[in-house]
């Protein structure tokens, strides 16, 4: 890929500004954890694995900002840093997974000097980024055999390199199939209201030379019924113990349409996206975002002033609509409750 989603550089965090794509490829530099939190909240960086990496790097930046003489004082302030980052996006479990991992690193080194702890936290954040890239490639390797020669794959939102440290989850599967020499095409839903499919997925695939056709969200059923789509692959922000999956709003509709038209619907996500503490998708918290995201498009009003708006950012697809969950450890099918537990060794 010819872009970097996020990286640690000279004790600063550098992110591609996804709100400026596809018009401008701009990289922002962040020197403090508060600005990283705002970048996550403002969707300058988005996608569950990517915001996990961003949160980890935010913790590492925050640790460098803390003024303390004792570990107890450092720990109290680090908890505040973590709390600020944790409040940015409530649905994506990778955010909380990364923050908890950083907390454990600090606690396990509490007997060391604070300089060592700060450097160890920086190293851990970089390690999380590097691991995510390897995980995405493994997801691609496991998922590519599910994409047959000549397939046309529908994807929703953006689960590509921009949503991860690189390569992608759903787009990682597509990339791996393409790299294996398969002649495939992609249909990308535009994904209202943020247009991640139009702005980001189409941009990524075109940069990689993978054939992509952009469609409006309400066209998916039409093309499925016509036989133009042969598989669906999406990412995930949180997966419950029974396989119910939270992903970008509109995913549930795509899954239902796929089932009706006998098209396999796959979820591609790292094991860190699993939340086995939740019995079902009914327990997944759903972020509700500002009304202006629906009433305005690129700053221009597209709805009457004062209209009532609902804007959930995610929906939950019941496991019965999912043909398989593709992870870095393999593909899970069927009895998700049993197989997901086995996957993580529970």
From Swiss-Prot:
Q: Where is the active site?
A: 237
Q: What are the entry keywords?
A: Amino-acid biosynthesis, Isomerase, Methionine biosynthesis
Reaction(s) this enzyme catalyzes, per UniProt: 5-(methylsulfanyl)-alpha-D-ribose 1-phosphate = 5-(methylsulfanyl)-D-ribulose 1-phosphate
Q: From what superkingdom does this record's organism come? A: Bacteria
Annotated positions binding substrate: 46-48, 89, 196, 247-248
Give the UniProt family note.
Belongs to the eIF-2B alpha/beta/delta subunits family. MtnA subfamily.
GO terms (molecular function) for this protein are: S-methyl-5-thioribose-1-phosphate isomerase activity
Its biological function? Catalyzes the interconversion of methylthioribose-1-phosphate (MTR-1-P) into methylthioribulose-1-phosphate (MTRu-1-P).
Protein name from the UniProt record: Methylthioribose-1-phosphate isomerase
Q: Determine if Isomerase is one of this entry's keywords.
A: yes
Q: Which GO terms describe its biological process?
A: L-methionine salvage from methylthioadenosine
What the entry lists under NCBIfam families is as follows:
eIF-2B_rel, PRK05720.1, salvage_mtnA
Task: Extract the InterPro entries matched here.
Answer: IF-2B-related, IF-M1Pi, IF_2B-like_C, Initiation_fac_2B_a/b/d, M1Pi_N, NagB/RpiA_transferase-like
Q: In which pathway does it act?
A: Amino-acid biosynthesis; L-methionine biosynthesis via salvage pathway; L-methionine from S-methyl-5-thio-alpha-D-ribose 1-phosphate: step 1/6
Q: Where is this site: Transition state stabilizer?
A: 157
Q: What is one Pfam family matched by this protein?
A: IF-2B
Q: Which organism is it from?
A: Geotalea daltonii (strain DSM 22248 / JCM 15807 / FRC-32) (Geobacter daltonii)
EC number, as in UniProt: 5.3.1.23
* Chain segments annotated as transmembrane: none
